[in-house]
Amino acid sequence: MDVIEGNTVVSNITKIVVVVARFNKAINNHLLEGTIDTLKRVGQVQDENITIVWVPGAYELPLVSQALSISNKYDAIIVLGTIIRGITEHFEFIYKSCNFGLSNISISNLVPIGLGLLVTNDIGQAVERIGIKGNNKGSEAALAALEMINILKTIKNNN
């Protein structure tokens, strides 16, 4: 029986791009710190192989991710952002558009996208997910991206 699993250590030429929404920057900075720490410490990705792209808000994440994915410069994309429920339906439109767009980009272009997009009801829930109490969703997105790089390489090499 064949079992394909990815590990989280990548080659020294692996290139990762992190796309971060500037809106809710105080929260997203913590996500970014967790992402970078995990890429370097766990994945052993070198500084020169990490690119950070800032975009205005979460709605812009899919467009920039699409442009980066078709550039063929990166082995994975990690997106970071925070969408906090407001009093309007704008919240649902934004998070559904982001998730749908990012999913399509990953599937269509065969580029792993580590999803570090927080969707919360309030600021307290967002703070719980940025690592102050032990878990950082940016770090989790980085781990998923690293593992997916290796899984896709294994599949490609087995064909």
Curated annotation (Swiss-Prot):
(2S)-2-hydroxy-3-oxobutyl phosphate binds at residue 129. Gene3D superfamilies: Lumazine/riboflavin synthase. Its EC number is 2.5.1.78. The active site is at 90 (proton donor). 5-amino-6-(D-ribitylamino)uracil binds at residues 23, 58-60, 82-84, 115. One of its GO terms (biological process) is riboflavin biosynthetic process. It comes from the Bacteria. It comes from Blochmanniella floridana. CDD domains: Lumazine_synthase-I. Keywords: Riboflavin biosynthesis, Transferase. This is 6,7-dimethyl-8-ribityllumazine synthase. Transmembrane segments: none annotated. Pathway: Cofactor biosynthesis; riboflavin biosynthesis; riboflavin from 2-hydroxy-3-oxobutyl phosphate and 5-amino-6-(D-ribitylamino)uracil: step 1/2. Catalyzes the formation of 6,7-dimethyl-8-ribityllumazine by condensation of 5-amino-6-(D-ribitylamino)uracil with 3,4-dihydroxy-2-butanone 4-phosphate. This is the penultimate step in the biosynthesis of riboflavin. HAMAP family: Lumazine_synth. GO terms for cellular component: cytosol; riboflavin synthase complex. InterPro entries: LS, LS/RS, LS/RS_sf. The gene is ribH. Forms an icosahedral capsid composed of 60 subunits, arranged as a dodecamer of pentamers. The keyword Transferase applies. Belongs to the DMRL synthase family.
